[in-house]
Amino acid sequence: MEGTKNMSTKTNKRDLSPKQREDLLKALKSRFEKNMSRHKGLDWTKVQARLEANPEKLWSLNEMERTGGEPDVVGQDKKTGEFIFVDCSEQTPSGRVSLCYDRAALDSRKEHKPKGSAVEMAAAMGIEMLTEEQYFELQKLGEFDTKRSSWIATPPEIRKLGGALYCDRRYGRVFVGHNGAESYYSGRGFRGSLRV
């Protein structure tokens, strides 16, 4: 009986406290209302209802917020009704920089290892790294990564050869670049997306 009691009082580490939940919803609502051009025709009350019905998604959004991503709604999937959140910080999220691309890249470094990898951090946060297509779509909503850059999901055929892709905006246009996946920079992080 006592073991059952202890189990029931344990909280899932992916649960937010009521205060965290309230603060996050307030920040998300404020950002949503200030940036209506990112999600024309969408209604915050419907977004909030979805969020409240999916507490594990709130935890992931809180991780996006905590690491500097400033997540916001950028669309809605017409088939599933899911709202699509993306990191909309002006520069790549500051809490996600100095990461190599993935675990294989991290393991390949003999010395001067970075603190982690973008792919693993995204998975731990419960989000997906942006694809090249998603990154270009985001750039239609504003000017992002004008001073920094963001790793993007890299096709397996490029990754197999040791490379990884990143994107940024310079000189008024968006670029896709490549580096060895084991490289890391203080000015490069990654942007994520989450469907709710």
Across the structure, where does each feature detected by a protein language model lie?
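A binding-site-centric feature that preferentially detects glycan-recognition modules on secreted/surface proteins
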Residues: 2-128, 132-196
